[in-house]
Each structure stands twice: as structure tokens, then as C-alpha cells.
């Protein structure tokens, strides 16, 4: 089994300039990475869209080697065709306290290392005692969390910010949309008041928001049902 916090620098380079990288963050469960093919397909699509070089080896084999047999968070970064894999422990799931970021959301269609807007939003959220933040577009529409996609229940329907706002369509978001009907919407922050909210990503699955902008968030039993079914057998 691979150690608790390991970095594999698969193809070391000496004196290489710092460049933008593409990243995929995955969850290993009992040594298996759900949606590994989806992660690598998204990575390949971003490589093509950005005109970046592909790695010379099989990334799937590298990820499996890094995972070992346990439950891990796996971060794959690819810069100029050079892969690096890091693993860490899985944090405990809990309802989170989320605030609205003052940082204006800029379109983020590819999962790259250019994540400064999310870093600033997360730092500001932690400064006021929150776990995370939701960013809002320049047009005033709720966009996404710092490493999550957002969902909410509204009049019997499950909703999520529309992809054309410029969000990263995460694999956790895709999984939820495979499990149930979801309405993509463009809404202001005020539209979330009193709604039951949750976040998703491919590492922690579904995590309920317990407090939003200082107000308790009502729970919806349908969220627990989705959470139970989220991870494939």
C-alpha cells in the first residue's frame, strides 16, 4: 500500500520553466478510482482544446500504482506532457458553512492550475470562519464553489448553475445529473435563500451545506437518498 501523503514525480525535469498545468482530483475507494475513464477523458479534451502535449505513458496505470489498495484522494497534474501524482488522506464528511465570495467568478471551463480566484475566495471564507465559498459571475449569477459544483432544491426540482455561466462541469455534477432530473439555472444569490443546498465533487461526493451566509440551511431527505446512491458499487 502506498504511504499516507506521497508525491510521484513521474518524469523529473531539470531547469524546466513553470507553465500552466491541467489537474484532475480523484477519489480512490478500496483501491479503485470511480470514473477514472471520465477523469482522463476530460483531461484529454482539455489537452486538445488548449493545444498542450500529451504524456508519453499510460496515465491510468500511473494512477492505479499511486493508489495502492486503500481509500485515498489522488491529484494528477500534467504540465507540458509531464505527469505528477500526489495522494492524501480522505477528510471526514460533514455539513459545511458556506459564504458568498467577494471574488468575482471568471469562466473556468478547463481544470487548470490557474486557480487563483478560487484560492482567494477560499482564504477569505476561512478568514470569517466558513469552510468554503460560492463565487458569483460578473452578471450576478451563482456559479460554483472553490472546488465544488452547487445544487439546490426548488419547488420539487433539483437545480444547478448552468454550464454556460462558465463553470467547470465536474464529474460529481455529472454523476448527480445521471441519477436524477436536474434543471440548469441562472439565478442570483437571493434565489438560494431558504433552499436546501448541497455541494458535489468527485472526491467527497455529496456534502450538504449546513449554513449559508450565516443562516441555517433546511435539510431535504432527497439529498441523503442521492448521497447514498452516489458511489458506484
Residues covered by each model-derived region:
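Glycine- and Gly-Pro-enriched alpha-helical subdomains that act as flexible
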Residues: 142-163
